[in-house]
């Protein structure tokens, strides 16, 4: 899988990321579009994974401070799940974080995919959990070494 990065919304990478997010979150999971497209994409980094130049996986990256990176909107196209693309995407993000001297990654995981993140050594940081867009979530984190 080939990865492309961009910042903001005036680029093809963002448009490709948005197409995956619309399919996964709005169409599949029925997340309200005003929640998914929250008006903050223009200040975030976006990464998209391509297979044969077709966008298949994406995430939104939000540096919170000099040490902490928040990973958001992680999505893999429905037809490509279970093939390791999500793992490749997370590896790409972790490599980018290390290159840019981030020490800690945090994310809000939908409960059904917590095992995916646990396999990548993320730990639940709030045992009580919460609902976001009607979907149960838990915060998770990983310290980079």
Locations of regions flagged by a protein language model:
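Conserved GNAT acetyl-CoA-binding A-motif
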Residues: 90, 95-110
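Conserved catalytic-core motifs of GNAT/GCN5-like acyltransferases
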Residues: 108, 123-139
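Conserved beta-strand in the GNAT
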Residues: 48, 54-63, 67-75
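Conserved acetyl-CoA-binding loop-helix of GNAT-fold acetyltransferases
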Residues: 76, 82-95
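A conserved beta-turn-beta hairpin within the catalytic core of GNAT-like acetyltransferases
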Residues: 63-72, 81, 131-137
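Conserved active-site tyrosine of GNAT-family acetyltransferases
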Residues: 21, 117-118, 122
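Short amphipathic alpha-helix that is part of the acyltransferase structural core
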Residues: 1-41, 46, 50-54
């Amino acid at each position: 899988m080939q990865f492309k990065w961009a910042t903001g919304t005036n680029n093809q990478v963002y448009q490709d990321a948005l197409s995956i997010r619309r399919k996964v979150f709005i169409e599949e999971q029925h997340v309200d579009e005003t929640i998914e497209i929250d008006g903050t994409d223009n200040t975030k980094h976006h990464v998209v994974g391509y297979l044969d130049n077709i966008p298949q996986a994406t995430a939104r990256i939000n540096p919170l401070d000099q040490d902490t990176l928040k990973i958001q909107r992680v999505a893999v196209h429905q037809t490509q799940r279970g093939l390791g693309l999500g793992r490749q995407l997370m590896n790409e993000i972790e490599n980018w974080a290390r290159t840019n001297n981030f020490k800690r990654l945090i994310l809000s995981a939908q409960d059904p995919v917590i095992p995916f993140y646990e396999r990548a050594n993320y730990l639940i940081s709030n045992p009580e959990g919460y609902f976001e867009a009607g979907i149960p979530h838990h915060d998770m984190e990983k310290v980079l070494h």
